[in-house]
Regions:
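Short hydrophobic beta-strand element within catalytic cores of glycosyltransferases
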Residues: 366-370
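Donor nucleotide-sugar binding/catalytic pocket of nucleotide-sugar-dependent glycosyltransferases
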Residues: 187-191, 196-197, 204-257
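Basic, ligand-binding patches in group-transfer machinery
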Residues: 445-579
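A short, well-ordered alpha-helix in the C-terminal region of glycosyltransferases
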Residues: 321, 337, 410-425, 437
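Conserved acidic donor-binding segment of nucleotide-sugar-dependent glycosyltransferases
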Residues: 382-383, 387-394, 402-409
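Aromatic "clamp/platform" in nucleotide-sugar-dependent glycosyltransferases that forms part
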Residues: 330, 349
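Conserved donor-binding/catalytic core segment of Leloir-type glycosyltransferases
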Residues: 260-279, 285-288
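C-terminal alpha-helical cap of glycosyltransferases
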Residues: 403, 428-452
């Protein structure tokens, strides 16, 4: 559970006077009274409930467990797989010689076997193939599932029922399979919290983030996906990752009641950041040391911990900045330090939004930030409510700090006032209103399902400009897609892309520029046709047949696989357009 999700849920509950459930899947959460702990800590509103899959299952009666609908025919012999029980713990595990999980048995609070989760169904002792079996008190099989995804979906069906509901997913891990949870009565929303690329410094068409690859390829399967900033939304829209289902809803921040007129030591800087490579704290230390070397009084207090602490400690000593920079480690409620600080630094390589920037501004503390993707440039007006510096430019960062230190008191007070005013755009009320606008715009209309749709290649040709594709589509039913795309995915790595296709009766055409596939320098790609409806999404693997005509080049070989599907093999290095 992220702090952002807790704060948003509490804001929904408080401002809209509604009950909100936070759903968790981890077995480690079973038996932990996190709801009570969080409420006592003031982290959640009294109308917010923390609900855990395993806490539910281990306390439910057989009558309620039977509401969990399986997706495969029950095999009674599954009971023979039970592990010997070695104690009174609710879990028994079986692992291979390398410590990889092969089986987990879970027990009901009443003491009887509840679940057997085997993950070596293809060959015992080797991971591969899964079967999750749910048992009743009489130890007879209630239901079975071949995947954790189907198992989780069955639980969600019981939890949500038939009433209209809004399901907001904050987890990339869950997002990678929850996009398949489509129910007419559930509006499904995905929140993209961080950079969509595997390498934030890569070109826009580079590999997608591995931990998000499952859901980034299926954004149109959600009713709506939110980004935290307009700039990230624009970047994702330029790649056609979504057909108009992306929208911006920022994180909310607390009103810290920063006083622009409050006297503060001008030289006092603060920074809240993990001490990790992503946060690039070494640049902040170097900049402070440079400013101090020019006989300007300046200090920096850094709050946070992480793997880089030993390196940063050595750097502080080598820069003779022990009296200038202090590493405080993790401190609860560190954002309150901004109320007495004059300026803050952000030197990250990338951000989802940069919540710490909003916290600084809310406190009237002037942010001096690298203009990285994504966040600072969406929030800060340079020279008005803060300062923006080219990413990685330590000298530029030093210059910005020096500029701030040299401003008149009147200029600084005005800047603090502007910072607080800008932060107010992200306080709880306006962001909850924005969520209300986004969710109320969604529909509970029946979801269009076209599992039988078929797309077949007519011609596919590698030209000087790219790949020219013609195909025919059939069996899509009565509903017409509002948009169609040809998509491709690399078999290795996390490369994915799509371009919009055009339709003339049953003929579909698309042009894929070489530049879109340029980052894939070697290997195989598979092509599909994406059908996007107002509410509904289907990805159809494009088939080849005996009449399909393929024209390849020495760099890209187009062909039909042994299973009769349209694929390509990139033989050489990056393809470039000659147009």
């Amino acid at each position: 559970m992220t702090t952002v999700a807790l704060e948003r849920s509490s804001a929904f509950a408080r401002l809209d006077n509604r009950h909100v459930e936070i759903l968790t899947l981890s077995p480690e959460m079973k038996g932990l009274d996190r709801e009570r702990e969080l409420r006592e800590a003031g982290a959640i509103d009294r109308r917010v409930k923390i609900r855990n899959l395993w806490q539910d299952l281990t306390t439910w009666s057989d009558r309620k467990l039977r509401r969990m609908i399986g997706t495969i025919e029950p095999d009674p012999s599954a009971a023979d797989d039970v592990l010997d029980r070695t104690g009174q713990e609710w879990t028994e595990l079986r692992k291979d010689s390398e410590g990889r999980l092969l089986q987990a048995d879970r027990y009901h609070d009443r003491g009887h076997l509840l679940v057997i989760d085997r993950q070596d169904m293809k060959k015992r002792g080797r991971r591969g193939g899964r079967r999750i079996t749910l048992f009743g008190r009489d130890q007879k099989v209630i239901a079975q599932w071949p995947t954790a995804r189907d198992f989780y979906h069955a639980w969600l069906d019981v939890v949500i029922g038939d009433k209209p509901a809004y399901l907001i997913c904050d987890s990339a891990f869950v997002g990678n399979f929850i996009h398949e949870y489509r129910r007419d009565n559930v509006v499904l929303c995905m929140v993209n919290h961080n950079h969509y690329l595997a390498d934030a410094d890569d070109e826009a068409t580079g590999a997608l983030a591995e931990e998000k690859f499952g859901y980034l390829r299926h954004l149109d399967a959600f009713d709506v996906t939110t980004t935290l900033t307009d700039s990230q939304r624009y970047a994702m829209e330029r790649l056609d990752l979504s057909a108009g289902k992306l929208t911006t809803v920022s994180n909310l921040t607390d009103d810290l009641h920063g006083d622009p007129d409050r006297p503060r030591p001008r030289h006092k800087g603060s920074m809240i950041a993990r001490l990790s490579p992503q946060k690039r704290v070494e640049d902040a230390i170097a900049a402070i040391a440079d400013v101090a070397a020019n006989d300007q009084q300046v200090t920096l207090d850094v709050f946070g911990d992480g793997e880089d602490r030993p390196m940063l400690t050595e750097l502080i000593e080598s820069k003779d900045a022990v009296d200038r920079v202090r590493l405080h480690g993790h401190v609860d409620g560190a954002k309150s330090i901004f109320l007495s600080s004059s300026f803050s630094l952000l030197t990250s390589r990338f951000e989802g939004q940069g919540l710490v920037v909003l916290e600084s501004m809310s406190a009237g503390c002037i942010p001096i930030c690298y203009a990285v993707d994504f966040g600072p440039t969406d929030i800060i007006e340079h020279g008005v409510s803060g300062f923006l510096v080219a990413p990685g430019d330590v000298k530029g960062l030093s210059a910005a700090i020096s500029t701030f230190l040299s401003l008149s008191e009147g200029e600084v007070t005005s800047m603090r006032r502007n910072a607080v005013a800008r932060a107010a755009d992200f306080f709880h009320d306006p962001i909850v209103r924005r969520w209300g606008e986004v969710l109320s715009a969604q529909s509970f209309a029946p979801i269009v399902r076209t599992e039988n749709a078929r797309a077949e290649i007519h011609t596919a040709e590698v030209t000087s400009n790219g790949i020219s594709i013609e195909m025919r589509i059939s069996a899509i039913g009565k509903s017409m897609p509002k948009q169609m795309f040809v998509s491709w995915k690399s078999r290795t790595g996390t490369f994915f892309g799509r371009v919009e296709a055009e339709r003339c009766e049953d003929l579909i055409t698309a042009e894929i520029p070489h530049s879109r596939m340029g980052p894939i320098t070697d290997g195989y790609v598979d092509f599909s046709l994406d059908l996007v409806f107002d509410r509904g999404f289907e990805r159809v693997r494009i088939a080849g047949n005996e009449d399909s005509a393929f024209t390849s080049s020495d760099k890209l070989h187009l062909y039909s696989t042994k299973h009769g599907n349209f694929s390509g093999r990139i033989i050489s290095t990056a393809l470039t357009s000659t147009s």
